[in-house]
């Protein structure tokens, strides 16, 4: 019962969707023509009464009523409630389709895990898939009117071959008042366990895989049952329906054409048929009809699911896969492209133009950069962001005014760190201390002991303010230093890196 028009819209062309307007089966005209005729009939009856039946005084009162209804009908949020409602219904409709129990994955697992070409092996495989099909039939006849008309009783299910008479007795003897669509799945599990004990299923991993696929199949059957049980809340459906009907009830009065001689605003024309009001009714009422048709896709409407077709298809292909196709393989041969370095299937004359189109390499494949933008930049000696001196980061971490007094302990230590980590020139950085270059295995001797790491060393004196003459540092007595190994000689500082010596010490002083 599904209306398929996919081939008609395979290619976008002039008037592509316009051709679909001429279809009748599954169309909005087929759903809405009765309501549209009723609305037009009521409208014309009121218009005729206004023109030919009412007295002059009654006409003036009716005209005031028309203006009032036309003014306040727009307060009803028809578009708002219809938009949310139809979106909810369409999402629910697609989710129900995704829950249709298809046996394709299950039949492949059965064919690959239940072994035996004898009649016993065939019996196991066919019975397992028959149980899966029986579970689908039982749930579909519970939710679909089309399937229920096909299998109105369990006797019809037995006569169709989905259930044996012995299985029917066991099915009916189960003391349960709930829907028993799950019973064939339990039979499936018991039969699979028996096949494992007999060695038809060779290991527990295969049995686990088989039962996992069964649980997926059973879960879809259960979701169909719950979708049928739990509907869209009734209050939501009622609100949408009342909003639509009350809006067009107000339009029956408020959209009447009044006598132009009375001089009412926006009533300069006197037409008999309200063209745009009918179009508005067609759109809004058709919108509600879409939700009405999709809210339960297991009925007998033109666009409802083909449940009986699915039952026939699933039963046939499942039996074909586990019986006739079991262990049926073609002779292994080398493929056509066995010795080809690049395998490519041929193209017909209608599709060969696609070979001339370049393959997609990525969205950044065609981006070009200037030559200077592709040069790597040296980042040696940078511990912070670009353009920031090494001491700036330490100074930003200190609170305002803390240790900035010349001669203070914190100020002297910060000044020492600035002198130690700064890069002045290639000569000064190449031989900043005597421990930088020592023979391998010899103990380094350095006169630049770190007062932060060795509390026994005296703290250095505060440097004098930077003057016109360069600052000269006189090292103290040489003492062995074994706590921290000084780094090796550095390369020359980049020209864009400013030296913090002088300016930093002036600020600290």
From Swiss-Prot:
Topology in membrane: Multi-pass membrane protein
Stretches with biased composition (Pro residues): 457-468, 489-498
Domain of life: Eukaryota
Function in brief: Ligand-gated anion channel that allows the movement of anions across cell membranes when activated by calcium (Ca2+). Transports a large specter of anions, namely mediates the movement of chloride, L-glutamate and iodide. Calcium-binding triggers the dilation of the aperture, but calcium-dependent gating is only effective when the size of the passing anion is bigger than the closed aperture. Mediates the calcium-activated hydrogencarbonate movement and participates in colonic hydrogencarbonate secretion concomitant with mucin secretion.
Protein name: Bestrophin-2a
Keyword NAD annotated: no
Localization of this protein: Cell membrane; Basolateral cell membrane
Coiled-coil regions, chain positions: none
Segments on the Cytoplasmic side according to the record's topology features: 1-31, 83-238, 289-509
UniProt note on tissues of expression: Mainly confined to the retinal pigment epithelium. Expressed in colon.
Gene source species: Homo sapiens
Entry domain remark: The C-terminal auto-inhibitory segment (AS) modulates the open/closed conformation of the channel and determines paralog specificity among bestrophins. In a closed conformation, the C-terminal auto-inhibitory segment constricts the channel concentrically by wrapping around the channel periphery in an inter-protomer manner.
Keywords on record: Calcium, Cell membrane, Chloride, Chloride channel, Ion channel, Ion transport, Membrane, Metal-binding, Transmembrane, Transmembrane helix, Transport
Binding site for Ca(2+): 10, 293, 296, 301, 304
Membrane-spanning segments: 32-51, 61-82, 239-255, 275-288
BP terms from Gene Ontology: membrane depolarization; sensory perception of smell
PANTHER family associated with the record: BESTROPHIN, BESTROPHIN-2
Impact reported for residue 304 to A: Does not affect expression level. Does not affect interaction with GLUL. Does not affect tethering of GLUL to the membrane. Impairs channel activity
CC per GO annotation: basolateral plasma membrane; chloride channel complex; cilium; plasma membrane
Family: Belongs to the anion channel-forming bestrophin (TC 1.A.46) family. Calcium-sensitive chloride channel subfamily.
MF GO annotations: bicarbonate channel activity; chloride channel activity; intracellularly ligand-gated monoatomic ion channel activity; ligand-gated monoatomic anion channel activity; ligand-gated monoatomic cation channel activity; metal ion binding
Any one Pfam family match given in the protein's UniProt record, by short name: Bestrophin
